[in-house]
């Protein structure tokens, strides 16, 4: 609420995000889902001590994301939670918390703070810890990517999401491909779908 009030007061869009939800396992998927005013959280944080992958009893950040979005979209009828990536750099001259481990790529008309924030609010961005995409589009219920492939590197794209209805598995894999131009056509029973490129 305070972020929204500040944005209105300044007449500028402001994007706030929840940092490293698994640092000390601070948040559950239910808590992430229920704060519907929060639209962004760190699905990837490059700091080595934030429990990105979870442990044997707690979900990793991507699983938290799927669980939270299943609740938001399926039960609360709320907007989805978007995932951002950051490097969380603490040092700039060596060490294991240096810059360049995670970032976002925003599809905006030009490099302008307001346009970047507005594009993020519309979900027109992707998060990365290494892969670059030439294109991302979602039209006519078709999600299409074009991976900027590097010579000698192979890529795998998994389409992950949650279906509508009781008993649906949060974070189900809907498909996988090794193509540089992966495509997913919605069947109509998905709450959401996201692409994971490795």
Please report, for each region that a protein language model flagged, where it lies by residue.
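A metal-dependent hydrolase metal-coordination microenvironment
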Residues: 1-36, 44-51, 56-64, 71, ...
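Short, solvent-exposed loop/turn segments at the edges of secondary structure
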Residues: 35-38, 99-101
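C-terminal functional module detector
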Residues: 71-82, 87-198
């Amino acid at each position: 609420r305070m972020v929204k009030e500040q944005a209105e007061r300044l007449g500028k869009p402001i994007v706030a995000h929840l940092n490293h939800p698994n640092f000390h396992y601070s948040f559950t998927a239910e808590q992430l889902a229920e704060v519907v005013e929060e639209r962004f959280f760190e699905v990837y944080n490059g700091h080595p001590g934030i429990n990105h992958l979870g442990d044997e009893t707690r979900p990793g950040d991507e699983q938290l994301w799927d669980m939270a979005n299943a609740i938001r979209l399926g039960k609360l009828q709320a907007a989805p939670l978007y995932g951002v990536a950051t490097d969380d750099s603490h040092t700039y001259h060596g060490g294991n918390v240096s810059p360049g481990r995670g970032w976002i790529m925003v599809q905006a008309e030009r490099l302008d703070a307001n346009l970047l924030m507005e594009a993020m609010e519309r979900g027109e961005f992707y998060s990365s810890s290494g892969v670059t995409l030439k294109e991302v589009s979602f039209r006519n219920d078709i999600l299409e990517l074009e991976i900027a492939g590097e010579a000698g590197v192979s890529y795998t794209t998994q389409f992950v999401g949650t279906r509508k209805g009781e008993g649906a598995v949060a974070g189900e894999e809907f498909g996988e491909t090794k193509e540089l131009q992966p495509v997913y056509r919605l069947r109509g029973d998905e709450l959401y779908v996201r692409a994971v490129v490795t």
